[in-house]
Amino acid sequence: MRKSTVYSWINKKKYILKINVISIINYIWFKKTIMRFFLYPFSLIYFLVIKIIYILYKCNFKKTYNFNIPIIVIGNITVGGNGKTPLVIWLSKQLKKRKWKVGVVSRGYGRKYDFPIIINSNFTHDICGDEPILIHKRSNVPVAVSSNRILAIKMLLEYYNLDIIISDDGLQHHSMGRCIEWIVIDNNRKFGNNLLLPAGPMRETKKKLNKVNKVIINGCCRNKNIIKMNLYHKNYVINLLNGSKKRLNDLFPTILISGISNNKNFFSMVRKSGIIPIREISFPDHYIYDKNILTSLTKNNEHLLMTEKDSIKCKYFAKINWWYLPIYVFFSKKCKEVLLSSVEKKIIIFKFKNKKNNIFNKI
């Protein structure tokens, strides 16, 4: 048996195992099942741990690092993506349009190496992770990747003259000082069973919602007082192999694959566009794809459609019938102005303080 065949077989078994584990976890977290009560004691331990960590930082037993530049954290209080990365891209591009110099820091989930790094266009997902590459590609701003966000911020400030730094996730990273916190909530899944890890999907309690600057709902919401964010596409797909574009509705027959934290949202978005896929195949978030497995999914006349995040990992062995769907963020004019003006005020305040300090230092 050839090595590549054995490798594909092992990857297939790993995929099946991961999918089964994720299905069980989602069942416990998002359904009313008695199984969650068996994990509840561990959630109490988790609560005590995060409470102790919070107190240690609050009482200055552990150090919080502050910088002479505004840091905005875009995160959530549940496990999994709720639309954070598209929002980071949107905010980076909007601030760039307004002539502000923006940098981004990210954890870089799924990468093989742990050293801090600033992304360039030649880096691959195994070096810096799929989401940081996507942010860099779409927004064209400096992106630093490290499990230690303080190191990532210091790297950016060493090489770039920036006005603001955006942290993709990191809400629970207390050592990183910040002046703005935004929480993103997925309106479909919300908080699951409202329990803390591991009995539920929550990283911390809902009390955190009252302490942050903005709470943003991803999806339909009837409450007019809440900032609503919608994800949408422009009805075109891009070829992984040659970069050519095609109307989404012309992509038939189609097989959908998705390896993000909420695959159902992606599948639903495509179906609402009138596409009836032959199959919908879910992969775990940050999944490392196997060329042979993906190639075997389609026949000659079939198209393989994936998320843009998945395309970051698949473009190196792509086929001519593989496509991805770019996703964009939309806010109403009012919500957009509320968000951007609050960020710009902080930038201006920091600039004024720094200028004032420089004058005093010269005296």
UniProtKB/Swiss-Prot annotation:
InterPro entries: LpxK (IPR003758), P-loop_NTPase (IPR027417). GO terms for biological process: lipid A biosynthetic process; lipopolysaccharide core region biosynthetic process. It catalyses: a lipid A disaccharide + ATP = a lipid IVA + ADP + H(+). ATP binds at residues 78-85. Its EC number is 2.7.1.130. Keywords: ATP-binding, Kinase, Lipid A biosynthesis, Lipid biosynthesis, Lipid metabolism, Nucleotide-binding, Transferase. Belongs to the LpxK family. This is Tetraacyldisaccharide 4'-kinase. It comes from Wigglesworthia glossinidia brevipalpis.
